[in-house]
Design a protein with these regions (language model features):
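Sec-dependent bacterial lipoprotein signal peptides
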Residues: 1-18
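Ser/Thr-rich, Pro/Gly/Ala-heavy low-complexity intrinsically disordered linkers and tails
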Residues: 16-54
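N-terminal module-boundary/linker segments of secreted carbohydrate-active enzymes
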Residues: 43-78, 83-88, 104
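Surface-exposed intrinsically disordered loops and tails
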Residues: 50-56, 91, 168-177, 225-257, ...
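N-terminal alpha-helical segment
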Residues: 61, 78, 97, 368-372
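Flexible, low-complexity segments enriched for small/polar residues
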Residues: 66-73, 81-86, 102, 119-123, ...
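Alpha-helical oligomerization/assembly modules used to build nucleoprotein complexes
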Residues: 87-97
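Extended surface/linker regions that mediate inter-domain or inter-protein docking
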Residues: 95-276, 337, 341, 351, ...
Length: 402
């Protein structure tokens, strides 16, 4: 539903100018997302030619070993390791290579590499000072890195109720469990105080955007249907939620007009944003949860705090997606974990890490579904184990062939 085709995207690019820069131009997931295409514009980049190029690659475990060692341990392989692979022949070379990859995944250096990976992925790390409070921005990356090193379930990122703020000893490459001390509900990184502080903003929209882009690999608008709705603007509304499901001064008494159609159709993005953001609105600028007190500002004069009526009319409830209600953040985490696109995004991010690609959202480096179908199936059927997924990526044909 939300992964629209490039034709629909082109047809609607002028319909949603406020959100158009947030739509991936990678289209129907069959391209790299780089926007450069494969040919000169004269038809030179045919599928047959790509097949020929891909078919001409040869397996080179020695070259793969160098890349794997750098990615997974941050250093080049030792001469002993190089010779283990180089001196083997036939299938023994594959076995030697895979054994070394497993060894790399067991070393303390791998934990350090995962801290770097998750800091980059989460766009956070170190510490910040908010007023008189120092907030640790490393506990969310440490939680994800520990989960990866322990070969835990990726879905614990959204559902785990304890031990969500571990510390990391870089010298030893070890983690120590710790509880988050910001009160409120507990649901993996979704309730992490560092996340809440790092992405504090008007209406808590930056927090929602972080969740959306990090774990769904897609910019807003996130839910686009195929049937445009005339809402009296210069362009139609393309969302799947009813247009009146979000607030405005004339629909539920909201103080901001999220139903504005004078230029952009704001509801294309806010249909989803407004159903999630209230759940994150109770965390203040330090990431502390304030029970019953909305603690994020609005862009209105004198920055008054947001109100529930600003987001939704009284008949609406919070939700992850249309038809996927979530009354609180733990329920939101369960809905996120059950969304197939979340697993696909995880596989795509690991794939891009292995292949040395840039961020899937920031640089539009999408991964075609067909490319990672085998890894996604194994990931889903094997309990979403992160270390197993990384091993699968680093031993795939795409990684070992050059």
């Amino acid at each position: 539903m939300k992964r629209i085709s490039i034709l629909l995207l082109a047809a609607t690019s002028f319909a949603v100018p406020a959100c158009s820069s947030d739509v991936s131009t990678s289209g129907d997931d069959t391209g790299s997302g780089s926007g450069s295409g494969s040919g000169s514009g004269s038809g030179s980049g045919s599928q047959t030619e790509w097949d020929q190029v891909l078919g001409s690659r040869v397996t080179d475990y020695s070259a793969a070993l160098r890349v794997a060692s750098l990615r997974l341990n941050g250093t080049l392989p030792s001469m002993t390791e190089i010779n283990q692979v180089a001196s083997a022949t036939g299938d023994a070379q594959r076995i030697a290579y895979e054994a070394l990859v497993r060894d790399y995944l067991s070393r303390p250096a791998f934990a350090n590499q995962m801290m770097v990976f998750w800091r980059d992925t989460f766009k956070m790390g170190g510490k910040i000072t908010v007023g008189a409070t120092t907030v640790d921005l490393d506990t969310a990356p440490a939680f994800a890195a520990k989960l990866t090193v322990d070969n835990g379930s990726y879905m614990d990122l959204f559902t785990k109720a304890t031990g969500n703020c571990p510390t990391f000893n870089a010298g030893a490459g070890t983690f120590t469990d710790a509880e988050c001390a910001n009160a409120g509900p507990k649901a993996g990184v979704l309730t992490n105080p560092g996340v809440m502080a790092q992405f504090f903003s008007n209406f808590a929209f930056r927090r929602v955007r972080w969740v959306q882009e990090t774990f769904d690999c897609l910019r807003f608008p996130a839910e686009l249907g195929t049937t445009p709705t005339d809402v009296g603007g210069a362009a139609p509304y393309l969302g799947v939620w009813p247009f009146n499901s979000i607030a405005s001064p004339t629909n539920g008494g909201g103080r901001v007009n999220f139903q504005d159609v004078s230029s952009a159709i704001c509801a294309n993005c806010h249909q989803t944003l407004n159903h999630i953001a209230p759940l994150f609105a109770y965390y203040d600028g330090t990431g502390a949860y304030k029970t019953g007190v909305i603690s994020v500002p609005t862009p209105l004069d004198k920055a008054p705090p947001a109100q529930l009526s600003d987001y939704l009319p009284p008949t609406e409830t919070t939700a992850w997606r249309y038809g996927k209600a979530a009354a609180d953040i733990p329920a939101l985490g369960m809905q996120i974990a059950a969304d197939p696109d979340i697993a696909r995004c995880a596989v795509a991010r690991v794939w891009n890490f292995a292949l040395g690609k840039e961020d899937i959202v920031d640089q539009l480096v999408d991964v075609p579904k067909e490319t990672t179908a085998k890894q996604l199936e194994a990931f889903t059927q094997n309990g979403f184990k992160m270390k197993d997924l990384i091993f699968a990526a680093f031993t795939s044909d795409a990684f070992v062939k050059f």
